[in-house]
A protein has these predicted regions:
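C-terminal regulatory/effector modules of DNA-binding transcriptional regulators
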Residues: 41, 169-238
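Short linear motifs at protein or domain termini
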Residues: 1-100, 105, 210-238
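Residue-level recognition of short, well-ordered coil/turn positions
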Residues: 26, 61, 125, 190-191
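Mobile beta-alpha loop/short-helix "lid" or hinge segments that flank ligand
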Residues: 57-63, 155, 170-173
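Conserved amphipathic alpha-helical segments that form helical-bundle/coiled-coil interaction surfaces
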Residues: 79, 83, 102-166, 176-185, ...
Length: 238
């Protein structure tokens, strides 16, 4: 895996701005991303914008073609399934270590955070939801006390968050308390119970993501033959 480049202050500003637009659905899958337009909107030169887009491309959120430009990347079914295989391997290990190593204070913290995530999931504030959702999974990994594992898990969440937001705008979760149930399993202090709780959670997320992305899979295949032009996004079939 390539390491994302270090960003300057302006590059970081551009990175956060474009990433936020993707997560909020302002830049949907397949949408063209114009360096010129972003630079003008943010009042900066092309260089920091190009650095930001390069990092987003390395993270898998964007893709570029020579003489065609840059767009929000449309994943294939294999992309999504492969991503979740990796995520399951990483996060089940984090869950197992959490069950062994987390302190009582950390367990209480995670239970409260999970309740907040599930409460936000029943609202339409998806950006705030995603921030808390990423924080929850990051804290689980941090409590596993393995920095390399924590870093790897954090890298997987940008893509998952983007896919979760597809055709969002309503409630994000259909289950009553998915994250509270997850954390309760992790706090059982049994590594096997924690592992299965996380495995079930990730597999449920995969199923939900595949359903949300299904209309895009064929579009991603057909649009490969004609890369989307500037200012025009992908239109879903009715």
């Amino acid at each position: 895996m390539k390491t994302p480049p270090e960003l300057t202050t302006l590059s970081s500003e551009a990175y956060e701005s474009v990433r936020r637009r993707i997560l909020q659905g302002e830049l949907p899958l397949g949408e063209a991303v114009s360096r010129r337009r972003i630079a003008a909107e943010l009042g900066m030169s092309f260089l920091p914008v190009s650095e930001a887009l390069m990092r987003l491309e390395l993270e898998g959120l964007l893709e570029s073609r020579p003489r065609a430009g840059t767009r929000v990347r449309i994943p294939s079914r294999d992309d999504v399934q492969g991503h979740y295989i990796v995520r399951e391997a990483l996060e089940t290990q984090a869950a197992r270590l959490f069950a062994k190593l987390a302190t009582p204070r950390e367990r209480t913290e995670l239970k409260k955070l999970a309740a907040r995530v599930d409460a936000l999931a029943r609202k339409a504030d998806r950006l705030h939801y995603l921030q808390l959702h990423e924080r929850l999974h990051r804290r689980i990994a941090e409590c596993a006390r393995c920095p390399a594992l924590s870093h790897a898990i954090e890298q997987t969440h940008s893509l998952a968050s983007t896919w979760l937001c597809v055709q969002g705008g309503g409630k994000l979760e259909k289950l009553d308390h998915p994250h509270e149930d997850l954390v309760n399993g992790l706090c059982d202090r049994d590594p096997d119970v924690a592992t299965e709780a996380m495995r079930s959670h990730v597999q449920t997320s995969l199923q939900r993501t595949m359903i949300r992305l299904d209309p895009y899979f064929q579009l991603g295949h057909t649009s490969d033959r004609k890369f989307i032009r500037k200012g025009r996004g992908t239109t879903l079939p009715s």
